[in-house]
Design a protein with these regions (language model features):
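Short acidic/histidine-rich motifs immediately flanking catalytic phosphotransfer sites
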Residues: 76-78
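Class I (Rossmann-like) S-adenosyl-L-methionine-dependent methyltransferase catalytic domain
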Residues: 1-74, 100, 108-165
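A short, conserved alpha-helix within the catalytic core of class I
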Residues: 88-100
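A conserved beta-strand element that flanks and buttresses the S-adenosyl-L-methionine
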Residues: 80-84
Length: 165
């Protein structure tokens, strides 16, 4: 059996904001959010980072990045944002990364995970895709049980959760 990749192979270059970031931006604007953010697992979502900058200072972090400044582990920030990060990690790694993420978030966090069907070969609690990457699709109940918080938006493709400590 081939090894499952949980690295940058899942990153996407986007020409527009990700769907969860569009919704999060509306939420932050409505609530007049002003914060110091960590964009956890930024990947190639530079437009998402630029959108967060409308609401405060942003420190991108991604251990798989080709840019040195985004690979360096950050100091804690008021608010953490992780979009499509945790659904790419198998259970043990996901647990460790979630703990690290929540420890970096002093006041609040927002997490978006996939909830659409994902084709692949069953592997642990998700699937191995044809690209050799791990992906997990969450039900609303699973997402709330694993991450906590409250549902900000649920669509056919993603669930956006948030918590204000």
């Amino acid at each position: 059996m081939n090894a499952v990749t949980t690295s940058g192979k899942t990153q996407r270059v986007r020409n527009e904001l990700s769907a969860p970031m569009r919704e999060l931006s509306k939420f932050l604007e409505y609530n007049e959010w002003d914060s110091d953010f960590i964009h956890f697992g930024e990947g190639k979502a530079y437009l998402d980072t630029m959108e967060l900058e409308k609401f405060g200072k942003v420190r991108p972090y991604d251990p798989n990045s080709s840019e040195e400044h985004t690979r360096t582990f950050p100091t804690p920030r008021s608010t953490g944002v992780a979009i499509y990060v945790f659904n790419t990690l198998p259970p043990l790694k996901r647990e460790r990364v979630l703990l690290a993420f929540k420890n970096l978030c002093l006041d609040s966090w927002f997490i978006a995970v996939r909830c659409d069907p994902i084709a692949g070969t069953p592997h642990e609690d998700g699937v191995t895709t044809s690209r050799g990457t791990f992906q997990k699709s969450y039900s609303e109940k699973e997402a709330l049980a694993e991450f906590g918080g409250k549902v900000i938006k649920k669509t056919r493709g993603y669930i956006l959760l948030g918590v204000d400590k």
